[in-house]
Structure formats: C-alpha cells, structure tokens
Amino acid sequence: MKKMSNIYESAANTLGIFNSPCLTKVELRVACKGISDRDALSKPDPCVILKMQSHGQWFEVDRTEVIRTCINPVYSKLFTVDFYFEEVQRLRFEVHDISSNHNGLKEADFLGGMECTLGQIVSQRKLSKSLLKHGNTAGKSSITVIAEELSGNDDYVELAFNARKLDDKDFFSKSDPFLEIFRMNDDATQQLVHRTEVVMNNLSPAWKSFKVSVNSLCSGDPDRRLKCIVWDWDSNGKHDFIGEFTSTFKEMRGAMEGKQVQWECINPKYKAKKKNYKNSGMVILNQCKIHKMHSFLDYIMGGCQIQFTVAIDFTASNGDPRNSCSLHYIHPYQPNEYLKALVAVGEICQDYDSDKMFPAFGFGARIPPEYTVSHDFAINFNEDNPECAGIQGVVEAYQSCLPKLQLYGPTNIAPIIQKVAKSASEETNTKEASQYFILLILTDGVITDMADTREAIVHASHLPMSVIIVGVGNADFSDMQMLDGDDGILRSPKGEPVLRDIVQFVPFRNFKHASPAALAKSVLAEVPNQVVDYYNGKGIKPKCSSEVYESSRTLAP
C-alpha cells in the first residue's frame, strides 16, 4: 500500500497554488444530529469549523455560529467556497463544543469531524456522514452538508417589439424607425443594451425579436429603470428623435404568456410646447420569454454522472516493461508517467461517479490467449465487464496485465473512441442529462490512424462525450495538436467540422517538474464548459427541477 499512497500523494499534494478563474461559488449549509458531550448531564454548545487542505496542511476557512445547549443543531451561517471541477478540494468539518466563556479552540472540546471533497458534496448535493473522533465514530452523531450553487443570473430574455402610429419625420416618405434600449446605471450613466434593425418607410414597424442576457438588460435587478428611445434613421448619421419611454424588466415581464405591454412614445419638447399633444406613437411589447441558461453544477446537482474511461497505450515503442528505461516500468516506490497521469485525472473524475466503477482498456498489444493484436481490450481481460473498482482498481489491473501482454503496435486510437462513443450514443436515447462520458487516452507516440481518429472525433462531438489525450514520454507530439481544436476547427477527412471542441491534448513532459495536480487542472478545466455546451445545445435541462432544489434545503440529516 506504500506504493499506492505515494501515487496518491504525488497526484494531489499541491492545491491552491494556481490562479485559474473560479468556475462558480458554492454555498454549503450544515446541520448535525445526535451530538454527544463528554458531560452526559449537559448538552454541548456546538460550532462547526470548515477547514480546507492546501500544500498538505489544513487551514480554517470559516466557522458557524455557536448554538447553545443543542444536540441537533441546524446552522444559519452558510459557508461560501470557490468550486473548481479540475481540482481535488479536500474539506474537513470539525464540530467543537465552545464554552460560553471562550471562543478559542484550546478551551473547546472536539466532538467529531468529517473529511470529504467538495466534488463529493456537489455531486450528491446532500452528503450525510458519521462524525469521527480519533478515527472512530463519535457515538451516533452525524453531520449533513448541502450544496447550492451561488451564481449570477445567467438567464437571457427574448423580446419582440412593434410600434403603431409613430410620428412622420420625413418629407417625401415615412419615417425609418429603430429602437434603442438603455440600462440606467447606479452612477446615473446609461449603457446601451440593444439596438434594433431599421424598418424602412413604416410608421407601424414590427422589429425582429432579439435575445439579451438578464445581467446585460438590468444587472439582475428587475426594478432597474430602462430608457427606450425611438429614432428615425438618416443616412447621414444624424438620426431624428421620435420619442421615448421608460420601463423596467419587471414591467416587461407582463408580456409573458401571450399578453402585451404598451407604452406611449413621448417627445418631451412636443409635450411642453403643444397643448393638445398626446404622444408620438405607441410602442408595444408582444413577447417576453425568459430562457434559463443552466450551469455545470445545475447538471451535476441534477444527478448527471461523469462516466470516466481510461485507455492505455501498450505499443512496443514504450519499451520492455522489465527494463527500467521503459515508460511502463513499475518502480517499487515511484509511479511511472502513465500512473501519475491516470491517478491525477481519475481521482477528480471519480467524485462525480456514484458507483466508482471505471472501464479500463488497452490498445496496441498482443493479448492472450491467441496473442492477436487488439486496440480496445479490457486490461482486466474481462471483455464482458471491463470495469475496475475505483482508480486503485484501474492501477492494480494495469500492473497485473503488463506481464501478460506482448507490446506491439500500431498506435490506433479510433477503435477506443468509437467504443466509448457507442455507449454515449446509447445515452442520447434517454433525452436526459444522465451520463456524460470522459475518455482519457494515455499514449507515448503520434497516432497512426489519424484519418479514422478525426472521423471518430467529429462523430463524438455530437454526443455527451469529451476526449483527453496525454502524451507520455519524449516523442514529438506536434502532429497531435491538430486534434485539439484550440488552434483551428478539426475536420473529418470528408471535410465535416466538429460540432464542438471536445478534445484536449497535453504532453506530460510539460508537467514533469510540477505536481500532477497541475496536469489535471490543464486537461480538465474545459470539461464543465463542454458539458454545458452539449446539454444546452441540445435543449436538455437538468433532471432535477427547481422544486427539488427547494426541497433540498431541508437540513434534517
């Protein structure tokens, strides 16, 4: 087990040293049940302290209020933490009995603790575990932590305006009206939110519907004032003012469900000068639709599972595993690059898979008993059930299969992409956000079936699937960069472009002198966006409804 512990330590021993942008913030609600005090005659005054691990050390992040004489506390204090999918964020919840005379921990009694990762909490949305004290359960006491995403309003709104009987500003034709909408900021400035197209020669125009984010429209404040101005377009750029009105997003929402909202378009100068002035026309909002933009955590908390699959290169270019120069050499204490990459990425993905069973395949080797070449064999040699129990199970299957293989070639990865794509394709039949597939391919050389691989990736880009390729060793991987769509659009040999960028390629040597956690951050940082892009693009909502979210706030353990 010393070997495994070294692998895990090297995979996650440097957290918090990177400055990547935070994906989102998460609120954690805490409750405890059945807390027991050392003094059986009195009830404790419990407080929960949240600690986070960084560089192998635990640091206090925040603490709840103290609830006096209570064995089943439900805390009102929320913990707010930054969430990074691409990191293992280790948390420790400690329950202390805080004396009424002291707030320091030296005088407090430690009542129990619980360790987990933030990924485990958000993937389950409600995590309940027994409190442990010195490695043993602290009586029947337990702690429950509920996660809720704290994010800005990412929804967008679709609006459709028309006007009626606008003032005519042209001598030889009718006005050419367009509409501008401005957000009134707190500092009294105005921010243009949208400008419609010009409708030529028409006093009762119907402008095309348009979409704008709620944040852009009103900064998330439905009562923020909006100024709407109607202009008569002129080719010289000196547009004529027709009229204006003010509204709010709250008022505009009155045009939902087939209703209309209308405003008088007023020219203040005309209103001041003309006694019989009524208005310069009417502006009507015919449609107000609010479109929900779901986040990565919406899908994860809604029950979407990350299905993690690994594929390992067993071609002869890796070298004889019995030789210490081989990329597959099993050192008694130092994990090889294949193991480092596998554990670094797999340790993060496993938090989002409830059964912790991971299919693991190999390619490029001759396998027993006939020793024919295979490019998608199960490394546990059980083709009917290629799954391994946890990342440790994958590591053990890898170490066990090495002596039984004949490393061969070529380096073909299209078959393994197609195998996982088949499972992802079956998932699309559910029409739900149930499973998203991540395929980790570990290879030591440039692939030899580039055309077939491009075809497979283009097909997979239409499925709930992402592909991560890690180049192991010192080969020239420059040709592999074309699979990563960052520098351009990947196309199949027939010219069909990928629907979305699903491939991330990195050479392991770029992280040789950094923690494997840095490798995981690099290859997994784009996964949340890829998940959201797929499901939002398909119009698939998270399985969990808003009502379930509300009910999840019930903190009874």
Swiss-Prot record:
InterPro entries the UniProt entry points to: C2_dom, C2_domain_sf, C2B_Copine, Copine, Copine_C, VWF_A, vWFA_dom_sf
Residue ranges annotated for the VWFA domain, each copy included: 305-507
Domain of life: Eukaryota
GO cellular component: glutamatergic synapse; synapse
Residues that coordinate or bind Ca(2+) 2: D170, D232, D234, D240
GO molecular function: calcium-dependent phospholipid binding; metal ion binding
Gene this protein is translated from: Cpne4
Protein name (record): Copine-4
Cofactor(s) needed for function: Ca(2+)
Keywords (A to Z) from UniProt: Calcium, Metal-binding, Repeat
Species, as recorded: Mus musculus
Pfam families listed in its UniProt record: C2, Copine
C2 domain: residues covered: 3-131, 137-264
CDD domains: C2A_Copine, C2B_Copine, vWA_copine_like
Calcium recorded as keyword: yes
Functional description taken from the UniProt entry: Probable calcium-dependent phospholipid-binding protein that may play a role in calcium-mediated intracellular processes.
Annotated residues for binding of Ca(2+) 1: D170, D176, D232, D234
Protein family membership: Belongs to the copine family.
Quaternary structure annotation from Swiss-Prot or TrEMBL: Interacts (via VWFA domain) with ACTB, BCOR, BICD2, CCDC22, CDC42BPB, CEP162, MYCBP2, NONO, PDCD6, PITPNM2, RDX, SKIL, SKT, SPTBN1, UBE2O and WTAP.
